[in-house]
């Protein structure tokens, strides 16, 4: 069995996978409000469990998870868990998932300056598991690793080169675990070897990015040094003129940290629509012809379309355009609006297919479409499980 952990500052999402025959999750859970007034909940065999517990820290939360797995006889002993895979947001220039050694843990620590909101929580969880399960192999799967194949011309910024040499200022990109899963799944769907696969993948969730996949590898992506760059998102601005920060700081007598917080937490769909960070709520107002909601949706769609056209220019041929993540998988209206904006590629959507229910993936383009368009449900936890399994064998 493989335990997959995604640790946040006050929560731990986890899945337990049975890997004996196929790779299937047998338990899906969440430890929430760690350090506040915590509780643990999970689902196993269609039965839901919830346990109130103070959960003073991450170690206590992981101990409770393991205790409940034993109590409920989901596992008979801890050694049945062969490996633990962790989602780590930032790995700097680490290019692949890695067994967690002291050296790898040190590199994750070094990347805290690049992901101060995310990496510390992963480090705490890793140290807790190391203490509670000292004989179990641990693997770190990095959201940045997949994009380490980008050429220098795509990852360097047009700033003094010493900023890269001294401070690591470059494009890293994110959502890499999701992109890796989508590349593998697309290879299977299209019956084409990964190394021959050219895709444009739109990972549209509350956080959103696009990746240009050339010969099965990341060639360019929209997020940058941090997840703030690129597309307009739920609460993030995406790309803006950086001088806006200095201008607003002077106008409002506000420090740069507060401005960055606003760009991360109060911008994007929420900032422009003044309705919500949730695309479903914004689309409700869009249907009612609310002016700000209409502008927000049109802006969102336009930016995604612009990136698709930009990335199409990198590729000699495109095997598919793929939509994934919360909005990409579920918002048929957004998929349709984006494809209509990409006039150069002649993406033709079949409305019946686009609106049809599906479980895993579906083709949403019509026979007239120059390029096939798919909606594919991503599965980052399964990807982490597979990477963990491959590394600990």
Swiss-Prot record:
Q: Name one GO biological process term.
A: acetyl-CoA biosynthetic process
Listed A to Z, the keywords are: ATP-binding, Cytoplasm, Kinase, Magnesium, Metal-binding, Nucleotide-binding, Transferase
Where does the chain bind ATP?
A: 13, 203-207, 278-280, 326-330
Q: Which residues form the active site?
A: 143
Q: What does the entry list as the binding residues for substrate? A: 87
Biological or metabolic pathway of the protein? Metabolic intermediate biosynthesis; acetyl-CoA biosynthesis; acetyl-CoA from acetate: step 1/2
Q: Output this protein's name.
A: Acetate kinase
Taxonomy, top ranks, is: Bacteria, Bacillati, Mycoplasmatota, Mollicutes, Mycoplasmataceae
